[in-house]
C-alpha cells in the first residue's frame, strides 16, 4: 500500500487535533532524529551494535521522523505537497538540477 503525504497529513491532523502542540511534536521529532543519529553511528561502527537488523531499525526511525515532521505541518494546516513542490523548484534552480520534482512526476505519469 502506498501512502500519500496528503493522506498522512489528514490522518495526523485527525489524530492530534486538539491534543498536541507544535512544541510537543517538535520535541518528539528531535528525539527521533537522535535515534536516527544513534543508528547511523552503529552502522558506521562508531557505536556498538547488538547484531539486530540496523537497516530495518533505521527505516523504522526514519518513519518516526517523517511522522512527527508531517504532524507539525498537519496541526498547523500546512499543505506539504504544495510546499515540497515549491521548495524543490527553488532548490532545482539554485543547485542547477537537470529536472525538478514536478517535472519528474509529470514525466513518470506519462511513462
Report the location of each language-model feature.
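Flexible "arm" and connector segments at domain edges
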Residues: 1-62, 66-111
Amino acid at each position: 500500500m502506498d501512502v500519500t503525504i496528503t493522506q498522512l497529513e489528514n490522518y495526523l491532523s485527525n489524530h492530534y487535533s486538539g491534543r498536541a502542540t507544535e512544541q510537543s511534536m517538535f520535541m518528539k521529532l528531535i528525539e527521533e532524529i537522535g535515534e536516527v543519529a544513534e543508528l547511523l553511528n552503529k552502522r558506521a561502527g562508531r557505536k556498538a551494535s547488538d547484531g539486530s537488523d540496523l537497516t530495518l531499525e533505521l527505516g523504522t526511525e526514519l518513519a518516526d521522523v517523517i511522522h512527527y515532521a508531517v504532524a507539525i505541518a498537519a496541526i498547523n494546516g500546512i499543505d506539504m505537497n504544495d510546499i515540497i513542490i515549491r521548495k524543490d523548484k527553488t532548490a532545482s534552480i539554485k543547485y542547477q538540477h537537470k529536472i525538478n520534482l514536478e517535472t519528474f512526476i509529470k514525466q513518470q505519469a506519462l511513462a
